[in-house]
């Protein structure tokens, strides 16, 4: 599959996942909020779903390359065994350049892996034979698991977790990034031809700690809402917001 074709398919898939993931929460909140006026337009109403495949994908994942608990190879094998069709590994500040020779930044890995008993562990990758087997699905009825290239979670040392996931372009490796700075990685990824999403904004805004859903519409959050809206409008390659990560 050509790179541009796959990017278009993934763009469509990402947008669909985020839209349908948001609907239950929006309706649940709207049911108890009488003073909020909004309309939801389904951009996929005319899609003939009978002619499109349905794929099980995971696009935001970590390993011991950054702050994950499991080895790089184990993460891949686990998703494959669970029947996934598409996988991206997006370790903090470290571009996924290969599933056979994992890329890692030792100083960054040590800093982010402080929770682990052994903060630095050299990640292990797949053998070339196993990589070929997984991506072709030769031991799974021909249903291979597609690797999304160059996955990374940008701004690894941001003090308020202003993180941005990106794919398809080799950007951000070893770059510490800035606190509250979503725009720099989004802009640079777009310039290189990649795709991105804004991650778990509730960690940045503090809204994840609100127990009352109605307070999500408090004017105190207008600044953040406008900030994200501007980024999404200005950079078409930023496809949306990963709102469900870590309980947001």
Residue spans for each PLM region:
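Structural recognition of alpha->loop->beta junctions
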Residues: 214-247
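A metal-dependent hydrolase metal-coordination microenvironment
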Residues: 35-209, 236-238, 242-248
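Bacterial N-terminal signal peptides that target proteins for export
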Residues: 2-13
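Sec-dependent signal peptide cleavage junction
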Residues: 20-33
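A generic local structural motif
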Residues: 4-5, 43-44, 73-75, 225-229
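Hydrophobic alpha-helical transmembrane signal-anchor segments
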Residues: 14-19
